[in-house]
């Protein structure tokens, strides 16, 4: 079972749809309707933290759940990505340019969720906040960027935790299904 934390975003059920299409049983809970303890007691195989219209610290259990997930594979999307960065000490700051419904080419490290994806694939972005690159802690690797150097992907160096700033669940993102499939294959031999 995959646990999907809904940060009150319209894209949450796009994620639900894509993940279900990939054959996963998905349970959805709003970020203020379940505790971290209840999430962990469910023993999910994987966790996805959805996008949302606020900051990570306004996103209910999102940041504490990232800190508590341990070895449960976890993917953060947009706000979920920012929650991962925030949980490990990165700063979330205003982006130089607000990106609502705009695509950008994504350069990546071809590992983890990006394994086998084309370089510079187009991804849709809906955000006004970003992770400040000078604040990324040692245990986090930057895995993807825009041509201007904005962080579009991060990965924990020792835990199965990744985040993407863009929206793989949007039809406007090339290879979105494959990126999510790569996440679902974490820990599968």
Where are these regions (language model features)?
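Structural signature of beta-strand start/N-cap positions in the alpha/beta core
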Residues: 1, 24-25, 45, 73-75, ...
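Histidine-centered divalent metal-coordination motifs
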Residues: 78, 127, 167
């Amino acid at each position: 079972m995959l646990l999907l934390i809904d940060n009150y975003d319209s894209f949450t059920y796009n994620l639900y749809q894509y993940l279900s299409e990939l054959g996963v049983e998905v349970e959805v809970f709003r970020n203020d309707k379940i505790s971290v303890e209840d999430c962990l007691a469910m023993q999910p195989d994987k966790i996805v933290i959805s996008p949302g219209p606020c900051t990570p610290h306004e996103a209910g259990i999102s940041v504490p759940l990232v800190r508590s997930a341990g070895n449960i594979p976890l993917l953060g999307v947009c706000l979920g990505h920012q929650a991962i960065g925030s949980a490990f000490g990165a700063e979330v700051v205003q982006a130089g340019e607000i990106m609502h419904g705009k695509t950008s080419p994504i350069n990546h490290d071809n590992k983890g969720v990006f394994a086998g994806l084309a370089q510079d694939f187009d991804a849709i972005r809906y955000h006004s906040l970003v992770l400040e690159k000078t604040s990324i802690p040692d245990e986090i690797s930057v895995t993807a960027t825009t041509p201007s150097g904005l962080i579009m992907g991060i990965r924990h160096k020792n835990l199965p935790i990744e985040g993407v700033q863009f929206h793989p669940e949007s039809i406007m993102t090339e290879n979105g299904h494959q990126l999510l499939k790569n996440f679902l294959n974490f820990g599968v031999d």
